[in-house]
């Protein structure tokens, strides 16, 4: 966090009653809610926790932001879809989540979008030099060590370089747009294909990557097709999101060696 900004730390689950007063006192121009349980399998077996964080607390944020006339930004997911579509999903497609995680995110979207000034950004498989870029870090760490990994061939997403998300969001805010938008990379590919791309670009042995399928390996169902069409966003802000080659190249150019913290 930039040290030029003030910080107030809250445990949203334990300090829920303080959310309204803290935000009201700050009176921000915009509130960006990035809080979530990212572990889909955890949410499948912890309904109360997932519902509290994703839905109930989102409702609290919507209420206080409405009171102080500050737009609220919410990050959502491809998991709101069932994955049966043969092409990329658009914002107009009907949601039908397979997992409890997806259900809570869909329910949160509905609460957010009840207020016209708010923004929902759906994205998927975010990657970059960041400790939370779990798939990318896991692949690169193991391949660098010469360890074999398995990667699914039956689940596809439009992996998204983090910088594209931040740029797109600032464009939306600066231009005073609101509503529901998909913000994801252009290339629809499986986790296996993504891992192969990473091996190619970083010079690691692709033979270490073993293709597998997700059946019976995850407690929560995922959409087989989680690919998002971001044309609406791109046209609105006049910006083209990266395909997978452009995204990985951008990642490499921003740091010529892999930072130790990610390995």
Where are each of the predicted segments found?
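Substrate-binding strand-loop-helix patch
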Residues: 129-131, 155-164, 183-201, 250
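Amphipathic terminal alpha-helices
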Residues: 244-263
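NAD(P)H-binding glycine-rich loop region in Rossmannoid oxidoreductase-like domains
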Residues: 13-53
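Mid/C-terminal beta-alpha module of Rossmann-like enzyme folds, strongest
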Residues: 168, 175-218, 224, 259-263
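NAD(P)-dependent short-chain dehydrogenase/reductase
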Residues: 110-157, 163-164, 171
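NAD(P)-cofactor binding segment of oxidoreductase domains
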Residues: 31, 45-73
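Catalytic helix-loop patch of NAD(P)-dependent Rossmann-fold dehydrogenases
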Residues: 52, 57, 80-121, 126-127, ...
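Rossmann-fold cofactor-recognition segment
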Residues: 2-16
């Amino acid at each position: 966090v930039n040290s030029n900004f003030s910080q107030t730390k809250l445990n949203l689950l334990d300090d829920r009653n303080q959310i309204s007063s803290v935000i009201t006192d700050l009176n921000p121009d915009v509130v960006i809610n990035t809080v979530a349980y990212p572990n889909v399998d955890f949410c499948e077996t912890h309904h109360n926790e997932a519902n509290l964080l994703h839905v109930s607390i989102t409702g609290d944020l919507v209420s206080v932001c409405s009171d102080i006339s500050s737009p609220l930004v919410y990050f959502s997911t491809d998991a709101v879809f069932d994955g049966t579509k043969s092409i990329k999903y658009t914002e107009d497609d009907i949601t039908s989540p397979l997992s409890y995680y997806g259900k809570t995110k869909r329910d949160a979207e509905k609460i957010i979008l009840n207020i016209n000034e708010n923004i929902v950004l759906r994205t998927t498989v975010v990657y970059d030099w960041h400790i939370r870029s779990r798939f990318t870090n896991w692949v690169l760490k193991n391949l660098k060590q010469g360890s074999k990994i398995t990667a699914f061939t039956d689940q596809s997403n439009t992996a998204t370089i983090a910088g594209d998300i931040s740029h797109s969001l600032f464009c939306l805010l600066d231009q005073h747009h609101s509503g529901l938008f998909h913000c994801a990379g252009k290339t629809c590919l499986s986790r296996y294909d993504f891992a192969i791309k990473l091996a190619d670009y970083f010079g690691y042995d692709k033979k270490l990557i073993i293709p597998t399928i997700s059946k019976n390996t995850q407690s929560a169902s995922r959409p087989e097709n989680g690919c998002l069409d971001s044309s609406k966003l791109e046209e609105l802000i006049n910006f083209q999101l990266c395909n997978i080659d452009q995204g990985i190249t951008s990642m490499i150019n921003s740091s010529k060696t892999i930072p130790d913290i990610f390995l």
